[in-house]
Amino acid sequence: MVHGHKGVKFQNWAKTYGCCPEMYYQPTSVEEIREVLALARQQNKRVKVVGGGHSPSDIACTDGFMIHMGKMNRVLKVDMEKKQVTVEAGILLADLHPQLDKHGLALSNLGAVSDVTAGGVIGSGTHNTGIKHGILATQVVELTLLTPDGTVLVCSESSNAEVFQAARVHLGCLGVILTVTLQCVPQFHLQETTFPSTLKEVLDNLDSHLKKSEYFRFLWFPHSENVSVIYQDHTNKPPSSSANWFWDYAIGFYLLEFLLWISTFVPGLVGWINRFFFWLLFNGKKENCNLSHKIFTYECRFKQHVQDWAIPREKTKEALLELKAMLEAHPKVVAHYPVEVRFTRADDILLSPCFQRDSCYMNIIMYRPYGKDVPRLDYWLAYETIMKKVGGRPHWAKAHNCTRKDFEKMYPAFRKFCAIREKLDPTGMFLNAYLEKVFY
């Protein structure tokens, strides 16, 4: 029989959201999860499944039953002929990478953070960059879903296809993802080339940059014209790195955190800090080569608040210039660097922010130096206004102020997803406060 724990406090990685579930479970088998769901049905409790806890919002929070999938973390099957791997949903991508390395395989695209689970990373619509590549969930070829009534559904394009179309970005509201089968590619190395540019140059030549590099993104430093362009492309060069502890940590983390803390008393310093650190750390060309997963992912050092919306790719220039103009017109509104801009191809996943359109993701950030919150409301609201104006859709894992009315306008298939959810979970067992705002 599965045993739960009382008094466990859950906090997300950034320590910006937390909750105290009534019971906290760490099941080791499907039968143990079934027991938790049966208990929840008997006691009329809500259930939330969590993985790595990296979502910077309350999407994972509940005061009911919490299921942590960390003990269901095995690689179940590697199909070398199809280049596919089947894993339990609780496996961290950081633990999957070395397993794929052993078989000469890799995932074709990854997000920046690998301390996330296979089930969670697809459920929130996690993405990287590359206009020829989709969000991470597009690499899923099959998944198994345990529904609230205890039924296991095997879902793919040929089996339970409608549920599959919904469950690849499931928001944790359809049931418990048990296993995920991912389409891999042969192991490959990437060369990352970083060089300075300007916002005008990048926006004027956006199509050219997108063609030049398979995984192109750029970082804009607000309160300036400064941009750091990042190309990542296949290479046969041996691993090499320009990493340096003094510049990456002593300057890029410790000094930056101290100066950002000072700026909470003198907000006008933020523009100077952005320009100073661009000059200090980003004003020259750098190259790194390594296995793909070591280039895609990087250490996320700062606790932070973020927003990340996907807009139609053709609206990139308009939206960024409007954000820049807003900051220039309102000097008391400050914005930490960077605004990270990435690109992703269209897909057919019902609640994917890239549903039926090539997209540009525009991620804004406000750090929490020494855990201190920095005023961000004016920046947040202005950004959201611009994103909505150009047809944006918010990242599901990240905080936003949207409601069902907004999502019905944003997503052509929103009502179809709702119908699937209501059929699978008619009592709302897998809802929480975050999801109630989405669906009601």
Swiss-Prot record:
<keyword id="KW-0256">Endoplasmic reticulum</keyword>
<dbReference type="InterPro" id="IPR030654">
    <property type="entry name" value="Sugar_lactone_oxidase"/>
</dbReference>
<dbReference type="GO" id="GO:0071949">
    <property type="term" value="F:FAD binding"/>
</dbReference>
<dbReference type="Pfam" id="PF04030">
    <property type="entry name" value="ALO"/>
</dbReference>
<dbReference type="GO" id="GO:0050105">
    <property type="term" value="F:L-gulonolactone oxidase activity"/>
</dbReference>
<dbReference type="InterPro" id="IPR006093">
    <property type="entry name" value="Oxy_OxRdtase_FAD_BS"/>
</dbReference>
<dbReference type="GO" id="GO:0050660">
    <property type="term" value="F:flavin adenine dinucleotide binding"/>
</dbReference>
<keyword id="KW-0560">Oxidoreductase</keyword>
<keyword id="KW-0812">Transmembrane</keyword>
<dbReference type="GO" id="GO:0016491">
    <property type="term" value="F:oxidoreductase activity"/>
</dbReference>
<feature type="domain" description="FAD-binding PCMH-type">
    <location>
        <begin position="17"/>
        <end position="187"/>
    </location>
</feature>
<dbReference type="InterPro" id="IPR010031">
    <property type="entry name" value="FAD_lactone_oxidase-like"/>
</dbReference>
<dbReference type="Pfam" id="PF01565">
    <property type="entry name" value="FAD_binding_4"/>
</dbReference>
<comment type="pathway">
    <text>Cofactor biosynthesis; L-ascorbate biosynthesis via UDP-alpha-D-glucuronate pathway; L-ascorbate from UDP-alpha-D-glucuronate: step 4/4.</text>
</comment>
<dbReference type="GO" id="GO:0005789">
    <property type="term" value="C:endoplasmic reticulum membrane"/>
</dbReference>
<comment type="function">
    <text>Oxidizes L-gulono-1,4-lactone to hydrogen peroxide and L-xylo-hexulonolactone which spontaneously isomerizes to L-ascorbate.</text>
</comment>
<dbReference type="InterPro" id="IPR006094">
    <property type="entry name" value="Oxid_FAD_bind_N"/>
</dbReference>
<dbReference type="InterPro" id="IPR016167">
    <property type="entry name" value="FAD-bd_PCMH_sub1"/>
</dbReference>
<protein>
    <recommendedName>
        <fullName>L-gulonolactone oxidase</fullName>
        <ecNumber>1.1.3.8</ecNumber>
    </recommendedName>
</protein>
<keyword id="KW-0472">Membrane</keyword>
<comment type="similarity">
    <text>Belongs to the oxygen-dependent FAD-linked oxidoreductase family.</text>
</comment>
<dbReference type="GO" id="GO:0019853">
    <property type="term" value="P:L-ascorbic acid biosynthetic process"/>
</dbReference>
<dbReference type="InterPro" id="IPR016169">
    <property type="entry name" value="FAD-bd_PCMH_sub2"/>
</dbReference>
<keyword id="KW-0492">Microsome</keyword>
<feature type="transmembrane region" description="Helical">
    <location>
        <begin position="253"/>
        <end position="273"/>
    </location>
</feature>
<keyword id="KW-1133">Transmembrane helix</keyword>
<dbReference type="GO" id="GO:0003885">
    <property type="term" value="F:D-arabinono-1,4-lactone oxidase activity"/>
</dbReference>
<keyword id="KW-0274">FAD</keyword>
<keyword id="KW-0060">Ascorbate biosynthesis</keyword>
<feature type="modified residue" description="Pros-8alpha-FAD histidine">
    <location>
        <position position="54"/>
    </location>
</feature>
<dbReference type="InterPro" id="IPR016166">
    <property type="entry name" value="FAD-bd_PCMH"/>
</dbReference>
<keyword id="KW-0285">Flavoprotein</keyword>
<dbReference type="InterPro" id="IPR036318">
    <property type="entry name" value="FAD-bd_PCMH-like_sf"/>
</dbReference>
<dbReference type="InterPro" id="IPR007173">
    <property type="entry name" value="ALO_C"/>
</dbReference>
<dbReference type="InterPro" id="IPR016171">
    <property type="entry name" value="Vanillyl_alc_oxidase_C-sub2"/>
</dbReference>
